[in-house]
UniProtKB/Swiss-Prot annotation:
Belongs to the IlvD/Edd family. It comes from Campylobacter lari (strain RM2100 / D67 / ATCC BAA-1060). Binds 1 [2Fe-2S] cluster per subunit. This cluster acts as a Lewis acid cofactor. The gene is ilvD. Gene3D superfamilies: IlvD/EDD C-terminal domain-like. Homodimer. The keyword rRNA processing does not apply. It is an enzyme of class 4 (lyase). The active site is at 472 (proton acceptor). One of its GO terms (biological process) is isoleucine biosynthetic process. This is Dihydroxy-acid dehydratase. One of its GO terms (cellular component) is cytosol. Functions in the biosynthesis of branched-chain amino acids. Catalyzes the dehydration of (2R,3R)-2,3-dihydroxy-3-methylpentanoate (2,3-dihydroxy-3-methylvalerate) into 2-oxo-3-methylpentanoate (2-oxo-3-methylvalerate) and of (2R)-2,3-dihydroxy-3-methylbutanoate (2,3-dihydroxyisovalerate) into 2-oxo-3-methylbutanoate (2-oxoisovalerate), the penultimate precursor to L-isoleucine and L-valine, respectively.
Length: 558
């Protein structure tokens, strides 16, 4: 056992003495030691109950002959951190989470790991840390929140609240309407109810085979979710000493491909691209951002979920057959690109896992011959504005897929929010928000407030928004993020001026500023990088080490 390094032989008497102080006895030193990486925190709706979930898991681990050791990571709620300086810390928190998993697991030489994530950067951060440790690992998340219901009986979610703020600013709704939506959008614990980043990543854990069936869709705080916790705890005890189930044997090039296929089929958050690039990096898998368009071109988009379709939520996907039903339907397409021989932590191949899966409601998960689109719900665009690529959630486009408009430039999200409220962005414009990339922010803020304001003001289908920052999974519209190289690296987005013509063609994967080469050269020669004051030592360190979005925003130590 890996844990013998802290519990076997006379030299380890001091180590055992400390372990005895934690309640262990002689028999316990012959059992596998299992790390239980929790992310309990009171301020996140998807996490405030995870302390109780950890108790269920630890109890089941003890019943099955192993010793659990719980520890915690930090967590940031992107929705609460939204629209102020707190969002600068969201993406950097992914690195702290990864580092904490690596630190605790390796410092104590634990044999296996069960992770309890749920929201935002916590799932990818835990995946990255677990890949560094490389022991048998299972992910079991807290589960999605059920959808809210407004006074008109319509299903709503957190994105409805952000958009309601825009509608209120545009005087389309009154204060009572706004309060009703605010109070009813998030009715219970869980990760926000649509196909936002949290649910996207928890779904992809299932697709990669690192989580049991139902992980992405079984509701939080349900009896079914509690049974999934017990099942995961029993399974980690069964595989704790089995090298076949080391996480790097599960998360491979093939399983990452499967995750991206599911991502495209379900129109996941654009943040998944950033995180999957980082996960591939930690797994030692070469994943080029250019590969993603090939995957998208070969995958039908068969499930639309809020915010792309505001009548469908994760609870509906679960009732309609869940992630397995989506995979099973995609596998029916001749020449599909799923890798069905991949092994998952249940001990089954993907082919075996989906054998009995089927769609139970074709209005929620469509058949391939009735797909929303014959291509996936995410795309990578290239051009002089994004030589290294940028990301768009095509599943969320509300208007035209070709767009030509004049740039309205802002040098921060805060500046953009003020400008949008004052009416500076009008129909036909391209709203440009720059210096918000991993280096420029630093921290790559999410642009949910600007996009939601535009949508709520009735401009969602009438303008485009481009940024070197990123978007919440709750964003919809012609919203293009992760522009690389970013403004802080001197990318062309930094040289744009108000009135420049920008052309976007989603179907041809292109994004360009219609500027002559001599004009670009002239602007480069006169360009001065804005001096952005950063007071945080952590953010300064992050800014010096982080790569741009085309590489996943990982810390580049080479």
């Amino acid at each position: 056992m890996r844990s013998d390094a802290i519990k076997k032989g006379h030299l380890k008497a001091p180590n055992r003495s400390l372990l005895r102080a934690c309640g262990l006895n002689d028999d316990d030193f012959n059992k596998p030691f299992i790390g239980v990486a929790n992310s309990y925190i009171d301020i996140i709706p998807g996490h405030f109950f995870l302390n109780e979930y950890a108790k269920i898991i630890k109890d089941e681990i003890r019943k099955n002959g192993c010793i659990p050791f719980e520890f915690n990571t930090i967590g940031v709620d992107d929705g609460i951190a939204m629209g102020h300086d707190g969002m600068l810390y969201s993406l950097p928190s992914r690195e702290i989470i990864a580092n904490s998993i690596e630190t605790v697991m390796n410092a104590h030489q634990l044999d296996a790991l069960i992770c309890i994530p749920n929201c935002d950067k916590i799932t990818p951060g835990m995946l990255m840390g677990a890949l560094r440790v490389n022991v048998p690992t299972i992910f079991v998340s807290g589960g999605p929140m059920r959808a809210g219901v407004n006074k008109h009986g319509e299903k709503i979610s957190l994105s409805s609240v952000f958009e309601a703020v825009g509608a209120y600013e545009a005087k389309k709704i009154n204060e009572d309407d706004l309060k009703d939506i605010e109070c009813k959008a998030c009715p219970s614990g869980g990760s926000c109810s649509g196909m936002f980043t949290a649910n996207s990543m928890n779904t992809l854990c299932e697709a990669m085979g690192i989580a049991l069936e139902g992980n992405g869709t079984i509701l939080a705080l349900s009896k079914e979710r509690e049974e999934l916790l017990r099942k995961a705890a029993r399974r980690i005890c069964e595989i704790a000493l089995d090298e076949r189930f080391k996480i790097r044997n599960i998360i491979t090039k093939k399983s990452i491909n499967n995750a991206l296929v599911v991502d495209m089929a379900m129109g996941g958050s654009s943040n998944t691209i950033l995180h999957m690039l980082a996960i591939a990096y930690e797994a030692g898998v070469n994943l080029d951002i250019k590969e993603l368009n090939h995957i998208s071109a070969n995958v039908a988009h068969i499930a639309k979920i809020a915010p792309s379709l505001n009548t469908v939520y994760m609870e509906d996907i679960h009732k309609a057959g869940g992630v397995s039903a989506v995979i099973a339907e995609i596998a029916k397409k001749p020449g599909h690109i799923l890798e069905l021989d991949t092994l998952d932590i249940s001990g089954k191949t993907l082919k075996e896992r989906i054998e009995n899966a089927s769609i139970k409601d074709e209005n929620i998960i469509r058949k391939i011959n009735n797909a929303y689109s014959n291509i996936g719900g995410l795309a990578i665009l290239f051009g002089n504005l994004a030589e290294q690529g940028c990301v768009i959630k095509t599943a969320g486009i509300m208007g035209e897929r070709k767009f030509k408009g004049k740039a309205v430039c802002f040098n921060s999200q805060e500046e953009a929010i003020k400008g949008i409220i004052k009416g500076k962005v009008k129909e036909g414009d391209v709203c440009v928000i720059r210096y918000e990339g991993p280096k420029g922010g630093p921290g790559m803020q999410e642009m949910l407030s600007p996009t939601s304001l535009l949508t709520g003001m009735g401009l969602g289908a009438k303008v485009a928004l481009i940024t070197d920052g990123r978007f919440s999974g709750a964003t919809r519209g012609l919203s293009i993020g992760h522009i690389s190289p970013e403004a802080a690296e001197g990318g062309l987005i930094a040289l744009l001026e108000d009135g420049d013509e920008i052309e976007i063609d989603v179907d041809n994967y292109s994004i360009n500023a219609n500027l002559a080469q001599d004009e670009i050269a002239k602007r480069k020669a006169n360009f001065k990088m804005p001096n952005k004051q950063i007071n945080s030592r952590w953010l300064k360190m992050y800014q010096k080490l982080v790569s741009n979005a085309s590489k996943g925003g990982v810390l580049d130590l080479e």
